[in-house]
Amino acid sequence: MKVFCGRANPTTGSLEWLEEDEHYDYHQEIARSSYADMLHDKDRNIKYYQGIRAAVSRVKDKGQKALVLDIGTGTGLLSMMAVTAGADFCYAVEVFKPMAEAAVKIVEKNGFSDKIKVINKHSTEVTVGPDGDLPCRANILVTELFDTELIGEGALPSYEHAHKHLVQEDCEAVPHRATVYAQLVESKRMWSWNKLFPVRVQTGLGEQLIIPPSELERCPGAPSVYDIQLNQVSPADFTVLSDVLPMFSVDFSKQVSSSAACHSKQFVPLASGQAQVVLSWWDIEMDPEGKIKCTMAPFWAQTDPQELQWRDHWMQCVYFLPQEEPIMQGSPRCLAAHHDDYCVWYSLQRTSPDENNSAYQVRPVCDCQAHLLWNRPRFGEINDQDRTDHYARALRTMLMPGSICLCVSDGSLLSVLAHHLGAEQVFTVESSVASYRLMKRIFKVNHLEDKITVINKRPELLTSADLEGKKVSLLLGEPFFTTSLLPWHNLYFWYVRTSVDQHLAPGAVVMPQAASLHAVIVEFRDLWRIRSPCGDCEGFDVHIMDDMIKHSLDFRESREAEPQPLWEYPCRSLSEPRQILTFDFQQPIPQQPMQSRGVMELRRPGKSHGAVLWMEYQLTPDSTVSTGLMNPAEDKGDCCWNPHCKQAVYFLSATLDPSAPLDGPQSVSYAVEFHPLTGDITMEFRLADDTLN
């Protein structure tokens, strides 16, 4: 059955109605899921297996039958481990229907159908009794309900319900315990992901300062955690202010509460500085003695950094304190971890832990609009002074006496740069109410409310009256739009340029003048694992899962690229970067598709895991900004990526299998096409052994 789905096209800006298979959202969820990554997480799998064996043995030693409840079974892997370890029966609960159906097939293929019952329900809907899903309560509780924040996938309510209704009072639990850790740091880089810094602009009259409104200064920020691969943040980017502090633990073998709580830990600062950021992670102990442990700690907090397990389904957390606060070395303070049933947040306090245990603080919520409009990388981008200087230098060469400027980018400070650098009049278009209000506040605090005109409408709908009857001599864009997911989605600027053509003066200049799409073939250190087939996992055949993911990838995105922040995922370039397509913003969008075909020669040995694509913008003939590679690759091919942007990754499936040979083809062929009518860029990359369609 087909269904019609409305979708806002991020490139053209139009609303499209697409005919989709009724299960299209299932396929996307499976295709972009972390199932493969979890199956490749050997440390996780081994520790779970060890913990399950120990739990089954403890129950058997009491002379009891081992009845296992596995919540969030996924592939059924943990249930199969339990039966292999000697469990008498397993009840495997999985709410996601396609996953539950796959688990049934995997369990059957591995010969465990007589000992594992897959229940396609949310665990809170599971019943116990003669006519229930379980005939009696289980005495072993096995779960994998955790995310990077530990509790973000509803672990606490699920455990709370299970202990009340589904398991025995003295049950064994795997994992047995989880502990959340925190470390207080000062970091200009990370703080720049949360607050707007004053921006300097060098003008002919000296330095001008763009200051943030007081509302942004006071705002506690976005309520959500920022989960990243913390191992890719250099220790030089932060100053440690505290030891690693165990903030709170959850014993999963006992009744768990999902009620809001606060846990305080007193510490003595290791250094004086500005307390700004809390780095946090957790570990899980699979047994009561804590001998079987799986940790998310970054390398500097590991006892043996050489044993570091890469994983993407569990990372580390960056939390921003509501306000930065000075602390003194040696002067005791308290760090408080607050949580409700799904979220964790932190505050810095002066009082003792005992006084804080009952102090519950409301979860911080953005009230300045900026954190709703700009995500963390966007804050970092706006705060990047080198980037601002780059745009300012380009603008100086473009501005002429009497310039009438129109700025088209979401929540951009380009309009302020244009004003300070001498534009006679500046208009800026903000499509959303949030960005309109935010920019009005920024202009007001900088005494620019009468100097820059903010227009709250979609740029395609601009009228001559909006521009006060004037013709635009300089059309500006970074370009940046909040709806963009892939690098080329910001080509929306070209569609805007085309729609406002009537408002441009003869000889009007557009900045950027042009854009280009670039690609390079890379070998990833680890990211390839998220799309790699597993085949066999701890002795269990999970090919059915591999096939399911492959089917969904073929259905949704076999020839699509996916956005990834590659500064978090090290890789080596195997080819030279290639310019694939060029887009001339001085001219309206052409009617005919733009195509490019070619072959990229591999210059370095390695596995061609995929092609990385990004955009570069030619601000002037002599000035270009890149959203991808920032510098030429080093001798070994190590890549340095723009940390403020996501790049697009097109995985080459033939090399993702760990058993694929290293000495593969020496070139990659490509075919890329830009479709002006839809704004889509279709692509195909193939190892030279294959032939492009």
UniProtKB/Swiss-Prot annotation:
What keywords are annotated for this sequence in UniProt?
Chromatin regulator, Cytoplasm, Differentiation, Methylation, Methyltransferase, Nucleus, Repeat, S-adenosyl-L-methionine, Transcription, Transcription regulation, Transferase
Q: What does this protein do?
A: Arginine methyltransferase that can both catalyze the formation of omega-N monomethylarginine (MMA) and symmetrical dimethylarginine (sDMA), with a preference for the formation of MMA. Specifically mediates the symmetrical dimethylation of arginine residues in the small nuclear ribonucleoproteins Sm D1 (SNRPD1) and Sm D3 (SNRPD3); such methylation being required for the assembly and biogenesis of snRNP core particles. Specifically mediates the symmetric dimethylation of histone H4 'Arg-3' to form H4R3me2s.
Q: Which InterPro entries match?
A: Arg_MeTrfase, MeTrfase_PRMT7, PRMT_dom, SAM-dependent_MTases_sf
**Which cysteines link up through disulfide bonds?**
none
| Catalytic machinery residues | 144, 153
Q: Which Pfam families match?
A: PrmA, PRMT_C
Presence of the UniProt keyword Methyltransferase in the record: yes
Compartments where found: Cytoplasm, Cytosol; Nucleus
Principal EC category = transferase
Q: What is the lineage of its organism?
A: Eukaryota, Metazoa, Chordata, Craniata, Vertebrata
Q: How does it assemble?
A: Homodimer and heterodimer. Interacts with CTCFL, PRMT5 and SNRPD3.
- What gene is this protein a product of? Prmt7
GO function terms (MF aspect): histone binding; histone H4 methyltransferase activity; histone H4R3 methyltransferase activity; histone methyltransferase activity; protein-arginine N-methyltransferase activity; protein-arginine omega-N monomethyltransferase activity; protein-arginine omega-N symmetric methyltransferase activity; ribonucleoprotein complex binding
Q: Which CDD domains match?
A: AdoMet_MTases
Tell me which domain of life the UniProt entry assigns to the organism this sequence originates from: Eukaryota
PTM Omega-N-methylarginine: list the residues: 32
Q: Which GO terms describe its cellular component?
A: cytosol; fibrillar center; nucleoplasm; nucleus
Annotated catalysed reactions: L-arginyl-[protein] + S-adenosyl-L-methionine = N(omega)-methyl-L-arginyl-[protein] + S-adenosyl-L-homocysteine + H(+)
Its EC number(s) = 2.1.1.321
Q: What is the organism of origin for this protein?
A: Rattus norvegicus (Rat)
Q: What is this protein called?
A: Protein arginine N-methyltransferase 7
What the entry lists under PANTHER family is as follows: PROTEIN ARGININE N-METHYLTRANSFERASE, PROTEIN ARGININE N-METHYLTRANSFERASE 7
- GO BP terms in the entry: chromatin remodeling; genomic imprinting; peptidyl-arginine methylation; regulation of DNA-templated transcription; spliceosomal snRNP assembly
Question: What are the residue boundaries of the SAM-dependent MTase PRMT-type domain, all occurrences included?
Answer: 14-345, 358-684
State the family it belongs to: Belongs to the class I-like SAM-binding methyltransferase superfamily. Protein arginine N-methyltransferase family. PRMT7 subfamily.
The protein's matches in SUPFAM superfamilies, at most eight in alphabetical order, are given as: S-adenosyl-L-methionine-dependent methyltransferases
